[in-house]
């Protein structure tokens, strides 16, 4: 279980880094540590991405706030807003109907915030989904590998 929580945390961190609103200079720099990977493509906001990762997935409810495709790490991340817990539960049922099985499900009450954070790892033997839900926000990490 700890492994899945660690994997979920890493995937969310990668997604948040890919979707951050960073201003990067196009001017060359001599600092090699200051380079941005060309493998991450920011996808259109407000539109459910259509690619090999999302193919066969039901379109999630809510509004796509940010989405990114990382060709180096072979994954796609989608962050949606306007999601209720009922929307989340309905989407999980749609994924189940599409052949996805829950591998791990973790929920945690966020102290002092009066809500529950839910993390779910699913697979259909072809794709792996890591889904994180907090009120009003759903993040989906999609890969073809469980690492």
Q: Which residues are covered by each model-predicted region?
A:
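Positively charged n-region of N-terminal signal peptides that target proteins for export
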Residues: 1-4
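An acidic-aromatic pocket/loop used at catalytic or ligand-binding sites
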Residues: 20-147
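C-terminal motif of bacterial Sec signal peptides marking the signal peptidase cleavage site
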Residues: 14-18
